[in-house]
Amino acid sequence: MGNANGKDEDAAAGSGGADVTSSSARSNGGDPSARSRHRRPSSDSMSSSPPGSPARSPSPFLFAPQVPVAPLQRANAPPPNNIQWNQSQRVFDNPPEQGIPTIITWNQGGNDVAVEGSWDNWRSRKKLQKSGKDHSILFVLPSGIYHYKVIVDGESKYIPDLPFVADEVGNVCNILDVHNFVPENPESIVEFEAPPSPDHSYGQTLPAAEDYAKEPLAVPPQLHLTLLGTTEETAIATKPQHVVLNHVFIEQGWTPQSIVALGLTHRFESKYITVVLYKPLTR
């Protein structure tokens, strides 16, 4: 049968070629030269003809450019490259890392249980999945406080075991506080706490009577460290303390002569100036 089909095709091709030739001959008045001019050139003549020859036919392998067209899709088929989210468990289109997973559970019976809340301005109602006697749903919500209510078999209800609030009309809805939970780990903050003071470093003994009988010091111990009575090199290298500024000091008996030295130290910005006045001791 394959050979028969091949013969039929060859015959059809031959007959088609004969029709073209005969029609061309008739249109040119039966001129043999015209018949030869309208005869299809062979592959050899096409290869030998110059590129600009009018007898050269266009190559069958050259196609016109086509504009890419989007593939057809069925009405019930999802669009290509589209990530399907579980709408019963996702309220927002945000990725999971931008929200906090939150589970709402209803365990007080009912066949058809749904929930609606302020996370989407009460626009949608999500159905809870039943597992045994409980109904639950998972939301991925941003941090914040939301109000919601449970619809059980078409009747609005709330969970009494969880925080709830009622409005002026008497409608009651639950409160959902969504926030990031950081578990407390006392061991992680021990190194930041100050070490406790030893108990033996403190006492509650009251001062004795002899402590009150002591006379106070005439001059504080800091005022004994003055520039008077020191060597010149030590006085230049030592920076005066702030407690000795603007105080007049007197030094006696530091020389064999009977001379009294009076000293006063001032500070001007970062510089210290000490003025020493020598006066003979009067008798």
UniProtKB/Swiss-Prot annotation:
Residues 1-63 are annotated as: Disordered. It is found in: Cell membrane. GO terms for biological process: fatty acid biosynthetic process; nitrate assimilation. Expressed in vegetative organs and, to lower extent, in reproductive organs. Residues 43-60 have a biased composition (Low complexity). A lipid is attached at residue 2 (N-myristoyl glycine). GO terms for cellular component: chloroplast; plasma membrane. Sumoylated by SIZ1. One of its GO terms (molecular function) is ATP binding. Its main location: membrane. Residues 1-10 have a biased composition (Basic and acidic residues). Pfam families: AMPK1_CBM, AMPKBI. Induction: Rapidly and strongly induced in the dark, quickly repressed by light. Keywords: ATP-binding, Carbohydrate metabolism, Cell membrane, Fatty acid biosynthesis, Fatty acid metabolism, Lipid biosynthesis, Lipid metabolism, Lipoprotein, Membrane, Myristate, Nitrate assimilation, Nucleotide-binding, Ubl conjugation. Belongs to the 5'-AMP-activated protein kinase beta subunit family. Kinase-interacting sequence (KIS) is specific for the alpha catalytic subunit interaction and Association with SNF1 Complex (ASC) is specific for the gamma non-catalytic regulatory subunit interaction. This is SNF1-related protein kinase regulatory subunit beta-1. The gene is KINB1.
